[in-house]
Regions:
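N-terminal signal peptide c-region/cleavage motif recognized by signal peptidases
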Residues: 18-20
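Mid-length scaffold segments of soluble, non-membrane domains
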Residues: 69-147
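N-terminal secretory signal peptides
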Residues: 24-78
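N-terminal export leaders
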Residues: 3-7, 11
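A short, compositionally biased
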Residues: 29-32, 144-148
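Cysteine/selenocysteine-centered motifs that mediate thiol-based redox chemistry or coordinate metal-sulfur cofactors
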Residues: 184-194
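Short strand-turn-strand beta-turns centered on an Asx-Gly dipeptide
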Residues: 154-157
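Flexible glycine-rich active-site/ligand-binding loops centered on an Asp-His dyad
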Residues: 159-186
Length: 194
């Protein structure tokens, strides 16, 4: 090896070392950082993908967990906080978003499960009743914090009341990860398979 090759190698190593420790995954122009923090705990991006309806791009979604998981059972059982981050890619009336939420919940939970979390489902519905339209670029975040509950944020601002039952958060996750997900290509993306 000559001096020039050694120098090039050192320069390349220095440039690589100066890159940020986090990288972003791009989904339809929406960047999802590799890490985020919920309730003071670092979370890792488990996966991110695109929700489409017919040919329309509706939103990009990312799932953050304390550790990467590749099965639905593991995701639902993982301890610690969790986050679902959604960025709208088009305007959607909240009535339509709420209807899709209800359909996804009904398709992936039993009647008994829904009855146990009915008060929280109603609270969640009230959140969308207060927001007439989710606009392109809006960021909806659903955080689960152990011993506290589920808190929703719209563009970084808390919306709605805390919903305390983990069964509710798991039911919401099954909208995307259940046996009948709202988008069959989004499920493997959130599980980090794509």
């Amino acid at each position: 090896m000559n001096r020039r090759q050694i120098l090039r190698g050192l320069v390349a190593a220095a440039l690589f070392a100066s890159l940020p420790a986090f990288a972003a995954i791009d989904v339809a122009g929406v960047k999802f950082d590799d890490t985020t923090t919920v309730a003071g705990q670092p979370l890792k991006l488990n996966g991110a993908g695109l929700r489409t309806k017919f040919v329309f791009k509706v939103y990009a979604a990312g799932l953050y967990l304390t550790e990467k998981k590749t099965s639905v059972a593991e995701v639902l059982a993982v301890p610690g906080p969790r986050r679902v981050a959604i960025t709208m890619l088009r305007d959607v009336p909240s009535e339509d978003f709420g209807k899709a939420f209800t359909e996804g919940l009904n398709a992936n939970t039993s009647k008994e499960e829904r009855n146990k979390i009915l008060p929280q489902i109603m609270k969640f519905g009230e959140i969308f009743a207060q927001t007439p339209t989710l606009k392109k670029g809006d960021q909806l975040t659903l955080d689960w914090t152990p011993n506290e509950g589920t808190q929703c944020y719209l563009n970084g601002k808390k919306i709605g009341e805390m919903m305390p039952d983990q069964a509710f958060y798991n039911a919401v996750l099954r909208i995307w990860l259940g046996d009948k997900p709202v988008d069959s290509s989004l499920k493997p993306a959130l599980l980090g398979e794509k």
